[in-house]
Amino acid sequence: MENMKRTIVLSFLFVMTGIFTCIGVSTDASWLAMLGAIASAIFGTIISMIFESIDTHGQGMKLWMQHIKYWKQDIRLSIAYLFRIEVDGKYLLVKGNRLKKQFQPVGGVYKFYAEAKPTLEKWGFRPDTKMGNIDETDDLRIYIKGRHLLSFMEWFASMRDREYDPYREFYEELLETKLLPTEPFSRLKYRKVMVHNNGVLYSKYMRCNELVYADIFELELSTKQKELIKAAVARNPDMLCLASAEEMISQCYNGIEKNVGNNAEWLIGG
């Protein structure tokens, strides 16, 4: 509240100094010109103070502006993680569970714990089940009003009452399905290398405004693990592939059009 009051006061001063600056530039009267010069000097300082007084919850000015723009509108959130698994300059992709004809990175949406539900309910969240995930209402694939965007992202960054270990999807997609042997991949070494987040954009596919966020984790592989992955791809060409960066960008693996998910290029910063 104090930050809001300060921002309002500074905004008023911003307008007034802007007016006096314009008067000073356009007048021949010496005293008005001097007043305009003083106002101009103050003008830049006030701009800086306004930006400093805005509480962006650590999310930057772009998202702050968007949470104002979409204040009363529903925003779809898809908060996920993906594995960058590189073998000999190519990247391991797996056939999707829902989009059966597309290869995509190993990974999926984070889940929230039961303890987080009161917080999410405070923001009026509702699960998004358009992807057929009617039994997975703990997925961080939800709708909230734009005014709660900053609070949500601050909560997510705190890692409180939510999943933060990406191993679950690796296990479900590659080990539980027997595509890779369990024992050599029972313990993984990985690190977060980047984040995909372009802010709120309109999705033609989902027909709504959405924020798609993905943590990208790079898997560090031993020589043995790399050989096991290459063997698995050779055995299961309908389920696994090693795609080049160019194939991921073009969404076209092995000359077949649009058989790679549009999220694959996120692994390389796309």
Where are these regions (language model features)?
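N-terminal leader/linker segments that precede catalytic domains of diphosphate-processing enzymes
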Residues: 1-270
